[in-house]
Amino acid sequence: MDGLGQRVLVIAFDGWNDAGEAASAAVSHLRAAGEYESVFSVDPELYFDYQYTRPQIRMEADGSRELVWPDATLWRPPYRAEGSRLWLLTGVEPARAWQAFAAELVDAALSEDITGIVALGSMMSDVPHTRPISIFSGSDNEQLRTALGVERPTYEGPVGILSVLGAAAEEAGIPTIALWASVPQYVAGYSPSPKATLALIDRLVEISGAEVDRGQLPAEALAWEASIDAAAADDEEMTEYIHQLEAARDTWDSPEASGDAIAQEFEKYLRRGGEGHGKPGRDDPRR
């Protein structure tokens, strides 16, 4: 197997796997950049709790209103004679029947001859907004890890729908990789997070070979970072916290840093009142 192949399905879901809306915004950006057509949607009555995920009223251009139900939809890209193509799967994390939900969507992927899957997720982490957004790239598929040079996940614990879909896809013979962006936890009020969205798309392009127009994302990422800088400038406690995170991140990233130096830096960070749980941006409760 040579990587993901040329018919790649990119997955993101609203909800638990989507801190700062970074993952869902990445798929929305991809869809807006191309002429996609819907090829499959699940029956919302089977999978969603409308008291938890309510239908929405949307205004149309002519002034009429449309009732929109929560869903999960597979989108097909326009035809290209050469190069990788990106199918999209996006929607709301289901409230029930996850195994049936995953089986339906994997069957739809097989009907589209999908050769590989990339699941996008994002999580709140103890990382600074002033540094590059870290992306964890992991796969349970040994051949894919070798081909792409990504890590093997070691997390044990509760998971989201991305993990369930990934396991079902692997069982069906579709190699799957997960990309997780670390979103600074102190910027929860600054969603969406275009810097994290851009980092996910950049990494997706690296591993898939697909061509993606970034559009206004780079400018939006800079504006997002500047808005947080401005907020921190008026908040001494926030500024100090960011400096602590920067020191921890810089120590971790330093090529000459020894294991002891890294441990000492994190001990100092924790003594100052940080609530980190290990490497910055690498502890992922959803992998």
Q: What role is predicted for each listed range?
A:
Residues 187-287:
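A conserved C-terminal secondary-structure "cap"
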Residues 13-17, 89-98, 148-156, 187-191:
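Flexible, glycine/proline-enriched loop segments at strand-loop-helix junctions
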Residues 21-25, 96, 100, 156, ...:
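Conserved active-site and cofactor/substrate-binding residues in soluble primary-metabolism enzymes
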Residues 126-207, 211:
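Catalytic cores of processing enzymes, dominated by hydrolases/peptidases
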Residues 84, 92-143, 165:
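Internal, conserved structured core segments that host functional sites
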Residues 1-91:
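N-terminal short beta-loop-beta anion/metal-coordinating cradle
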Residues 11-12, 90-91, 119-120, 180-182:
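Short beta-strand segments
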